[in-house]
Amino acid sequence: MTMTSKKRKALTAAGWRVGEAADFLRLTAEERQLVELRLTLALAIRRQRQASGLSQKQLGERLGTTQPRVAKIEVGAPDVSLDQLVRAYTAAGGRIECQPPRSPATGKASRLKVAL
């Protein structure tokens, strides 16, 4: 969730320091990307499960796990691995498409495109 610019200005004017959680936690660029990927997958799993008309219990049965574990998967809990997130998304009926960069690395950062 992002803060509105109006609220950000009001907090700054009141003397508060406003920033992102990643700044506060001093996450590296790689750690930020990992957190973003985990949260994106977790949100996609919940949306896909709901769109497929599945309960958390039903998705858990497909995965061979419990409803409480599915709840942890859907919030991207730290003890949930990336492969568990991917398995949950596909078990809910989702499909992941990866598109590698078009050309080899040229010293510049390249982007791997992932469509959920």
Task: Give residue ranges: language-model regions.
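Short, conserved catalytic or interaction motifs in soluble domains
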Residues: V75
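Short alpha-helical DNA-recognition segment
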Residues: G53-K72
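Short coil/loop linkers at secondary-structure junctions
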Residues: G15-R17, S55, T66, R95
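DNA major-groove recognition helix of helix-turn-helix/homeodomain DNA-binding modules
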Residues: L82-Q99
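Short basic helix-loop element that most often maps to the first helix and adjoining turn
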Residues: T12-A14, L43-Q58, R87
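N-terminal flexible/basic segments that precede or flank functional cores
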Residues: M1-T40, S103-L116
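Amphipathic alpha-helical interface surfaces
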Residues: K7, L37, L41, R69, ...
